[in-house]
From Swiss-Prot:
GO terms for biological process: protein transport. One of its GO terms (molecular function) is GTPase activity. This is Ras-related protein Rab7. InterPro entries: P-loop_NTPase, Small_GTP-bd, Small_GTPase. GTP binds at residues 15-22, 63-67, 125-128. The keyword Thylakoid does not apply. It comes from the Eukaryota. A lipid is attached at C205, C207 (S-geranylgeranyl cysteine). The keyword Metal-binding does not apply. Protein transport. Probably involved in vesicular traffic. Belongs to the small GTPase superfamily. Rab family.
Amino acid sequence: MASRRRMLLKVIILGDSGVGKTSLMNQYVNRKFSNQYKATIGADFLTKEVQFDDRLFTLQIWDTAGQERFQSLGVAFYRGADCCVLVHDVNVMKSFDNLNNWREEFLIQASPSDPENFPFVVLGNKVDVDGGNSRVVSEKKAKAWCASKGNIPYFETSAKEGFNVDAAFECIARNALKNEPEEEIYLPETIDVASGGRPQRSTGCEC
C-alpha cells in the first residue's frame, strides 16, 4: 500500500492577552478574522498540513491564554514544542516589554534539551491599527531585542488584513522542522474498506 510520510510539528504561541494570538492562528489556518474579542481559556490548538521539499508536515499550533492565572498550565502544553512564537502588539509597549518574561517562562517550563539554540520567532502584530499612527514599538526596537536574544526572526503582521501572516508561519514551520528529531508518521494514501482497513482519524487540518 502506498503511504505518505507526515511529521507532526508542535508550535506554541505566547504573549499577553489581547495581542492577537488567536486571530493570527485563525487567519493562517482558516483565512478568517473576527473583530469580536474573546479571551482564550486555558489553551486551544488548530492544525494545518504544509508541504516543504515534497514532504508533508502537520503543524499543530497551540494558542495559550495570556492571563497569569492560566500560566500554571504551561508545563503540560509547552513540553514537546518544536518552536515558540512570541507575539506583541506594536501599539502596546507593555506587551513588548513582557516578551522576555514569556520567553524565560517557556524555557523554564518546556525545558528544551538545548535552550540556547531553541527556535523562537517574534511577531509584532496589529500594524494596521490607525494606519500605523498608534504604534509605540518601532521595528528597529523590536529587531534590536531579537538580535540580543540570538538573532530571533522577526515579522510585522496584521491578523486582520492577513499581512505577512503566511510568510511568518512559513518561517515558523521551517524553524520547527530544524528542531524536530527524525520521527515520521506513515499514513496510508487510501483506505481499502473491503479488506477491513480502518479509516484514519481526522487531524482537523484545513487542507
